[in-house]
Amino acid sequence: MAVDKLPLLAKFEPVSLVGLVLLSGLFLLLTASRKSDLPLVNGKRPFEFGIAKARQRYLKNAHNLITAGLAKVCNSAGAFRIVTENGTRTILSPNYADDIRSHRDLSLSAALVKEHHVNIAGFDAVKVTVTSDIIQDTVRTKLTQNLLNITEPMSEEATILLKEQWTDNTDWHDVALRPKTLGIVAQLSSRVFLGDKVCRNPDWLRITVNYTIDSLMAAAELRLWPEMLRPLAARFLPKCKKIRKQLEEARDIIQPVIDERRLAQQEAIKQGKPQERYHDAIQWLAENTKDRSFEPAAMQLALSTAAIHTTTDLLGQTVLDLCGRDELIQELREEIISVFKDGSWDKSTMYKLKLMDSVIKESQRVKPMAIAKMARCAEEDVKLSDGTIIPKGEIILVSCSKMWDANVYPDPNTFDPHRFLKMRQPGSDQESFAQLVSPSPEHMGFGFGKHACPGRFFAAAELKVALCHIIMKYDFKVADGCNPQVLKSGMRLAADPFAKIAIRRRQEEVTF
């Protein structure tokens, strides 16, 4: 007989809860890793009895703290520790990027496990990423190999969405930028991940947009509890309950599509007809899993979690960087007209949009989504090439400081839309380095090493499709009275979520 265990929580005596807390604390002490000897840049100050103030200083001023930390250790190890909202982390100079890019004892999966409670119900989208290679295989092979097949459908979706949400109004009118860019990216991504039957489903779009944020908030809620109590606490914490409900809703939306396709395939086999193939992630995941079990809803949410908010942020920042640069917008229009004068989307289209590629890469360089990347957890004590020791259990990140280094980029604090285009001129040996999809220690917008974002080729294609439609179909500028500012919180940087732009429909010179 099934028993609802939730009411049991109310029956715990206070002394029992205290006992569990004490036991969990003892467990942490007994299993704790040995302490790092690296300097701490934002420890407790005099008369501070905890690290709450240190966390506040980190959230408000992480960029300066990391810059100061790198300056302090530049003549020694090039590594230091910093108190974050999730505990103490080790920050490495970008000079270590090659050291750790493929180190067998430094694990991305282990870092995700420590950060995201993957064994608790509701966090299934993270769990399928760290416990299986299906997602990574699907993105690296099927998604990247099918870019030519999915570009035209994304363009069709952009036409539908812009007409509906950006409208054909030829008068200047103000719109909130983030909801507009989020709508584009969510719908274009969903067209690729789930096909045309689901990509415009408002319930799916709501879930796919909200699950990422809600799961991060749920993870933050759980971190307030001792680790041993988190599975119990997750039963009643509001955000944890919310993401479990979203996962169930996702299953209810996706499973009928899978069932319908399975029946159609069985019928085709019965009649001796060829089975219909689909250019979407439902098909690719099924092909990649073969005999392996998988959770379709969790995997679809994993794809959305990885793709939507990151691409939305870069699209929004790029649009803001274009605002007020009318000559640059005209240059981009001329490039688009030149590329599309002889036809539509084909294998060479994305490569030919070199100025657009440079603009996006420069937007990402000036304002990436984080000032430190390459998160890894040491699964053993790790000795780096210069002798620096990373203790077992320590989570490390690599600073992105070379992205603003004057020795790498002249006038690094200035947005130069032609910076990477100039590197791709005939005879240059920087053609590969200068492309948007090329990660390096000098440009870690998509990370670096074997865990560099596997979906960066798709993201680049999606961004270019969206920008082609926006640039050709609309005039746009920052709305009167709006002064967009980068939102900073800890190591995270976000395009101004409250920014408004003024837009008006224009007659495009080419159609897609």
From Swiss-Prot:
E.C. code: 1.-.-.-
Disulfide bridges in this chain: none
Glycosylation sites: 86, 149, 210
Keywords of this entry: Glycoprotein, Heme, Iron, Membrane, Metal-binding, Monooxygenase, Oxidoreductase, Transmembrane, Transmembrane helix
Any single GO BP term: terpenoid biosynthetic process
GO molecular function: heme binding; iron ion binding; monooxygenase activity; oxidoreductase activity, acting on paired donors, with incorporation or reduction of molecular oxygen
Residues spanning the membrane: 12-32
Cofactors that this protein relies on: heme
Main EC class the enzyme belongs to: oxidoreductase
Pfam families: p450
Pathway(s) this gene product operates in, as recorded in its UniProt entry: Secondary metabolite biosynthesis; terpenoid biosynthesis
Binding site for heme: 453
Location(s) in or outside the cell: Membrane
One Gene Ontology cellular component annotation held by this UniProt entry: membrane
Main location: membrane
PANTHER family registered for this protein in UniProt: CYTOCHROME P450 (PTHR46206), CYTOCHROME P450 MONOOXYGENASE AUSG-RELATED (PTHR46206:SF2)
Similarity annotation: Belongs to the cytochrome P450 family.
Protein role: Cytochrome P450 monooxygenase; part of the gene cluster that mediates the biosynthesis of andrastins, meroterpenoid compounds that exhibit inhibitory activity against ras farnesyltransferase, suggesting that they could be promising leads for antitumor agents. The first step of the pathway is the synthesis of 3,5-dimethylorsellinic acid (DMOA) by the polyketide synthase adrD via condensation of one acetyl-CoA starter unit with 3 malonyl-CoA units and 2 methylations. DMAO is then converted to farnesyl-DMAO by the prenyltransferase adrG.
Protein name per Swiss-Prot or TrEMBL: Cytochrome P450 monooxygenase adrA
Originating organism: Penicillium rubens (strain ATCC 28089 / DSM 1075 / NRRL 1951 / Wisconsin 54-1255) (Penicillium chrysogenum)
Upper lineage: Eukaryota, Fungi, Dikarya, Ascomycota, Pezizomycotina
